[in-house]
From Swiss-Prot:
This is DNA topoisomerase 1. Belongs to the type IA topoisomerase family. Its EC number is 5.6.2.1. Keywords: DNA-binding, Isomerase, Topoisomerase. GO terms for biological process: DNA topological change. Monomer. Releases the supercoiling and torsional tension of DNA, which is introduced during the DNA replication and transcription, by transiently cleaving and rejoining one strand of the DNA duplex. Introduces a single-strand break via transesterification at a target site in duplex DNA. The scissile phosphodiester is attacked by the catalytic tyrosine of the enzyme, resulting in the formation of a DNA-(5'-phosphotyrosyl)-enzyme intermediate and the expulsion of a 3'-OH DNA strand. The free DNA strand then undergoes passage around the unbroken strand, thus removing DNA supercoils. It holds the Pfam family Zn_Ribbon_Topo. It catalyses: ATP-independent breakage of single-stranded DNA, followed by passage and rejoining. GO terms for molecular function: DNA binding; DNA topoisomerase type I (single strand cut, ATP-independent) activity.
Length: 18
């Protein structure tokens, strides 16, 4: 989605504001 990214890293769900 525009303005943010959500991704699964090392077994953890991470939300990175961009």
């Amino acid at each position: 989605a525009t303005g943010w990214s959500a991704f699964f890293i090392d077994g953890k769900w991470t939300e990175a504001k961009k």
